UniProtKB/Swiss-Prot annotation:
This is Small ribosomal subunit protein uS5. It holds the Pfam family Ribosomal_S5_C. One of its GO terms (cellular component) is small ribosomal subunit. One of its GO terms (biological process) is translation. The keyword RNA-binding applies. Part of the 30S ribosomal subunit. Contacts proteins S4 and S8. With S4 and S12 plays an important role in translational accuracy. Located at the back of the 30S subunit body where it stabilizes the conformation of the head with respect to the body. NCBIfam families: rpsE_bact. Belongs to the universal ribosomal protein uS5 family.
């Protein structure tokens, strides 16, 4: 997993709002409401990130979430229009199975997972949500899975072999 930071100012990022949730703090005088926003950003070219923001007004919560998402960008290794290999992303009780698909398949994913994959630029993939279906857990599991993907060239280099030797 590559841990170098990605500069968001050099990318043309697109934002997608996944959820806005009204949360309440119960105080002596009643309930105090705030809004929690969950946003995914990506350049549709191998970079994606997600963020959360909380504020008393919805637009402010979204703005904070976008700022947070830009700080958490990851690079997604791709082979053509899909991912290099199958992987299961895990976070909390949420598991996401991501499988490479042949060209023309499209993005087969539900809700929050679809937002992450489309903004990452993956256009052919099969996915299945297993366990928790909470949007934040689904997104975290997807991003965790995508961040652990490796290209055949990288694995071959780590093992000191050629790609041909590796693939048989």
């Amino acid at each position: 997993m590559n841990m170098r930071r990605i500069d968001p100012s050099k990318l043309e990022l697109e934002e997608r709002l996944v959820t806005v949730n009204r949360v309440a703090k119960v105080v002596k005088g009643g309930r105090r409401f705030r809004f929690a926003a969950l946003v995914v950003v990506g350049d549709k070219n191998g970079h994606v990130g997600f963020g959360t923001g909380k504020a008393q007004e919805v637009p402010e919560a979204i703005r904070k979430a976008v700022e947070d998402a830009k700080k958490n960008l990851i690079e997604v290794p791709m082979v053509g229009t899909t991912i290099p290999h199958e992987i299961i992303g895990r976070f909390g009780a949420g598991n996401i199975l991501l499988k490479p698909a042949s060209e023309g398949t499209g993005v087969i994913a539900g809700g929050p997972v679809r937002a992450v994959l489309e903004l990452a630029g993956v256009s052919d993939i099969l996915s299945k949500s297993l366990g928790s279906n909470t949007p934040i857990n689904m997104i975290r599991a997807t991003v965790q899975g995508l961040s652990e993907l490796k290209r055949a060239e990288d694995v071959a280099k780590l093992r000191g072999k050629s790609v041909e030797e590796l693939l048989g």
